[in-house]
Structures are given as C-alpha cells and as structure tokens.
C-alpha cells in the first residue's frame, strides 16, 4: 500500500476532542487506501510548561535530564492518540523516538538525526497497525534520550517519510498553508498553492514559524514533497516541492523575525585573524551568528557588528567582551530591540528593482535600516523591533501581494 506520513502540531492535539478529530482524519486517510505513520508534537503549551517547571526546581537543570523531561510531552500525545484510534475500532500503536529507530548525536536539546532504522515501524505497518511516533526526540549512541530542538517534530516527520519511502509528508497545523505574509499582521495576505524548497527554506529561516528549516532542508535534499494544511478543515493547503513552477517576476512572500539581537564591537583593530578569533570562539560556545557587517577601516580601526537570537545575546557578550579587551577594542554594545524583515522570491533572481522598491517603501514609512543582508532570492533588513509589523504591511502592499 502507498504510505503517507502525517504530522500534527501541538494545537491540533491540544485537548481530548482535538485528539479525536485528528484520529478521524487519520482513519479517513487509511480508508482512502494509504498506510499511515503519524508524528505528533506535545499537547498545546506542554513543552513550555515543562521548561518552566524545570527552572522552578533548579536554576541550572541538567541538559540530559531536561531532554528526558521534555520528551514526555510527545509521549503523552502519541499514547492518547493511539488510544483514540483503538477506541474507534482501528489497530494503532504508539512508539517513542527510540522505539521508532531514530538515532541522533549526543548534543542535548539540539540533537541532529544521524540515522533511522525503520524496521520496527515497518513491522507494525505490516501487522496492519497505524503507527504513532512521538516527535522531537531520539536516542543517542550512549542510549540517552535526546531532543531535536524547538520545531523538531517537523524534522522527525520528514526524516521518517524519507526513510520509509513515503509518497509525501503532510504537516497539519492551525493554519491553512503558507501565506504571502503572516495573516495575523496582514489580513490581506494570500495563501500560496505551492512554494519551492528554496523559498520555503528562506521563509523558515527568516521568521516564518510554519515549518522548521531543518525539515525543509531534508525535504529538499531527498525530494520529499511536504503539504502544509489545516487540521481543522479540508481546505487545500500549500505544497512545498521542487517541481518546475512558473517563474514569477515578483516577490513570493514577506516575513519578519523579532528574535534578533545585535552585538557591535566598537574600535576593532583592522588586522588579519581577529574576525577568525571572534567567530571561532562564538562557534565553540554554541552561539549561532546570522548577519555580519564590518565597516570600512579608517586609520586601521573598524566596527564589527553581528546578529544572534535574543536568547544568545548574553552568552555572545560573555564571549566577545574579554576578546575585545584583549585586542584593544573600545567597547561592546548589545541591542535586543530589533527585528529582521525579509522579502523572498525566486522571481527576484537577475531582475533589477526589488531592493530599490523595498528601501523606498521603508523610507516612505519612516523606517530606518540598520543592516542589510541578501541571498539570490532574499533581501533582509534589520530594523527597530516595534516597526516590524508596519514594515511587513507596507511591503506587502508595495509588492501587490494581495493580488496573489
């Protein structure tokens, strides 16, 4: 039988009635002729609640024990869903990440999937069961439970779909698909029928919370189509794939990310090796750096700015401040009140005018640009955090995305 992997987010399984609703959707897919493997997230705000509880017990929870704790959220959801399916007369079984054969590295809270042994899942499918897999987790070589980081259930689902040779991975959530902008910010935003892996990866990396970037990367590498749709209705969703789509000479979507902090090292001596030392030390500390800008040198002195997530700002300062003193820089300054706004679209390649329209629109709205970064299909600006929603609305109108 053809196989499909469903993934349901925390909102979709947020209470008993929603779990029963998901069970009915799974049964419909099974009745339509598909074998079904399901990946679930933890119910509602369970993960956040467990993190808060851990920090109430101790200010420094063990990374290993925190992973074990957080993995229980998905176990609860998967077992309840299996119970609901059995209550509706269908054979089903819940599996932890370890039982489903998901092997990871040992990097607690940010583990990466190294391999999947699908033998147990295939065996259960062969016995006619619907298989429910707890997302977001796996097991390391030392047999410790690991978690994949926030949004990791998406990665679990796509990785399982690839390893099982599924025809598609379908991600069901509380939105109907991928939009030209966040519809909560821009009511005129339009749902896209399809989007390329490249565009979706940029969207996911630069602010869209609908798909996790690592899941999109996996889909792109292995050519696994991913459908994003609502678990609350049967409306058509958005297909993420690598097919030959019509090249539109326009922006596809606009996204914003308010989880941005900028670190500036003022008065850096302009000599070889300093940037390597700074960013090498940040990498060793586990700090992920995004935009990097170095000013032109004046009399052998320059300023170096880079962005990190707000949660990493303190750690980044702790790394660079001693280095700044060591190299004779004047000071380190942090700004945690910023946001990234991006325009994204494959139609932007080799076509002039997009940057000019973007910058003119922001200027007309009195929005100051602090930093700029680009790729072949993206232009991103760093602006004041409180102006992000205003910038997205203005750019959505400027590029006429309401006509999509």
Give residue spans per PLM region.
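Conserved dinucleotide-binding and phosphotransfer motif residues
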Residues: 32, 88, 222, 285, ...
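Short hydrophobic alpha-helical runs that function as membrane-insertion/retention elements
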Residues: 168-172, 226-228, 290
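Glycine-rich beta-alpha junction loops
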Residues: 43, 175-177, 222-226, 230-235, ...
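Acidic-aromatic/histidine active-site loop/patch
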Residues: 219
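Nucleotide/pyrophosphate-binding catalytic subdomain
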Residues: 1-216, 307, 383-384, 399, ...
């Amino acid at each position: 039988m053809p196989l499909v992997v469903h993934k349901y987010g925390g909102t979709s399984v947020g209470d008993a009635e929603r779990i029963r609703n998901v069970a009915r959707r799974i049964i419909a897919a099974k009745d339509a002729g598909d074998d079904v493997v399901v990946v679930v997230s933890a119910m509602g705000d369970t993960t956040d609640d467990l993190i808060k509880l851990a920090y109430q017990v101790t200010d420094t929870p063990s990374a290993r024990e925190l992973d074990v704790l957080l993995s229980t959220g998905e176990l609860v959801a998967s077992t309840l869903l299996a119970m609901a399916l059995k209550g509706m007369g269908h054979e089903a079984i819940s599996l932890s990440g370890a039982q489903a054969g998901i092997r990871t590295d040992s990097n607690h809270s940010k583990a990466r999937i190294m391999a999947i042994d699908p033998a147990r899942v295939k065996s259960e499918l062969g016995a006619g069961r619907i298989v429910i897999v707890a997302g977001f987790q796996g097991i390391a070589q030392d047999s410790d439970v690991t978690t994949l980081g926030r949004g990791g259930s998406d990665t679990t689902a796509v990785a399982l779909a690839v390893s099982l040779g599924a025809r598609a991975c379908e991600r069901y959530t509380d939105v109907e698909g991928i939009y030209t902008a966040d519809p909560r910010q821009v009511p005129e935003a339009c749902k896209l029928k399809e989007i390329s892996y490249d565009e979706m990866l940029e969207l996911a990396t630069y602010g869209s919370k609908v798909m996790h970037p690592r899941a999109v990367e996996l889909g792109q590498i292995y050519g696994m189509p991913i459908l994003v749709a609502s678990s609350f209705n049967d409306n058509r969703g958005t297909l993420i794939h690598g097919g030959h789509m019509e090249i539109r000479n326009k922006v596809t979507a606009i996204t914003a990310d308010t989880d941005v902090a900028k670190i500036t090292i003022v008065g850096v001596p302009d000599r070889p090796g300093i940037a390597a030392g700074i960013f090498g030390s940040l990498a060793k500390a586990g700090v992920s750096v995004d935009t990097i800008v170095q000013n032109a040198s004046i009399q052998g002195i320059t300023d170096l700015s880079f962005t990190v997530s707000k949660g990493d700002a303190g750690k980044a300062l702790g790394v660079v401040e001693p280095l700044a003193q060591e190299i004779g820089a004047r000071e380190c300054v942090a700004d945690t009140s910023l946001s990234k706004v991006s325009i994204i679209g494959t139609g932007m390649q080799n076509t002039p005018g997009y940057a000019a329209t973007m910058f003119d629109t922001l200027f007309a709205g009195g929005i100051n640009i602090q930093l700029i970064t680009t790729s072949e299909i993206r232009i991103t600006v760093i602006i004041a955090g409180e102006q992000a929603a205003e910038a997205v609305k203005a750019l959505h109108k400027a590029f006429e995305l309401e006509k999509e």
